[in-house]
Amino acid sequence: MEYAIKEIARVIGAKTNQLLDDTVSLLLTDSRRLSFPEKSLFFALKTKTNDGHRYIQELYKLRVRNFVVSDMLPEFESMKDANFLIVKDTLRALQKLATHHRKQFNIPVIGITGSNGKTIVKEFPYQLLHNEFNIVRSPDRKSVV
């Protein structure tokens, strides 16, 4: 599913440096997982041990042009063909966008939690029911978001 950058900016309540007309279909929080830079929106998440803002210049060189940031650093000013959506908290912005996306679908959600067995519990009903029902599930072992 594609989203216009303008729509994403509205949904997450972002300020912008400028707003170039663009669409994205992939969300990126780990610069090492880049696959389609032209369609990616990078969220510069901050953790206790890392800061996603450190990877923006590298991603820009790899053709990513859409970023959600909490700090507009001086080195970003030269990236004139990039969109920077500026928010107070990038994690909260990601959560807002995920909530908005989820509301586009009128389907029940089943959450599976716990320390062990989530993947098999997710896969078992899929294997039983996917021929009769339209089922959406997280890929691979990404059962916890």
Question: In which residue ranges do the predicted regions lie?
Answer:
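N-terminal leader/targeting and accessory segments in enzymes
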Residues: 1-96
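Phosphate-binding loop of NTP-binding sites
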Residues: 9-12, 92-145
